Amino acid sequence: VKRWLLAILAAAALAGCSGVRMAYDNADTFIRWRLLQFLDVNGEQADELDERITRFMGWHRANALPKYARDAEDAAHRLESGLSREDLVWGYDIFIGHGREAMRAAVDQLAPLLDRLTPEQIRHMEQRVAEENRKFAREYLRGSERDRREQRARRIVERLEDWLGNLSKAQIEAVKQFSARAPLIDELRDRDNRRIQGEILALIRAHETWKRLGEKVVSWDKGRDPAYVAARTANVEEFNTMLLEIDRLATREQRARVVAELRRYSAEFRALAARPAS
């Protein structure tokens, strides 16, 4: 549940504005495809899944999109006025808050179906979760420390250039310095993901998702290894320092591009929220 919802939020944040409406119009198809990578359902259960996805999307259109529109406009205003560390903390908190709200709404729809899974269906889910973990290990846990830090820097540069256009040499150097300083947390993140997966699968096996999964997905950070909490905190602080340096080095054109993009997002989200569901 956590991963596919965050994937949707990330896609909305990183997609080109012209693609927001197309992405949202196909979000139900994406969610169904993602869930069917874990759920082995057919017949009436498959029809029920489709109905529950439709209800979730109705909730999201009415409740989440207006907030996204408001916050995108607020972010544009903050950036236009000059980025501060407080602005970055605000943005992070807003993103996490939206994710938790959406996950709780998704659980309200999915839990009744999850509570009726058979032992065979649960074993299928366990196998798929194990495959996801192996994929994560291939993408994030292989290679030397130097290789992984360089790969992290390349990913960040690509994402920043989606927003800013081509980065200057000084901006790229700021990214490299961040990646050299900030702790590598992927092993800790992998262990934490496995902890959360184990807790959620235990609820599914016990047929208690309706009673308890909603609280679990909005408080997934409870029970984290203190070492992971400390590493995440240090990582976020270093990342924010890097973003402030990127902002300090930004050209007028780069800043205007991001502000305009955020305002286009806001307009797109408002239009989608106002449009009748198909």
Whereabouts are the PLM-identified features?
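C-terminal motif of bacterial Sec signal peptides marking the signal peptidase cleavage site
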Residues: A15-G16
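A cross-kingdom marker for long, charged
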Residues: A23, R32-W33, D190, Q197-S278
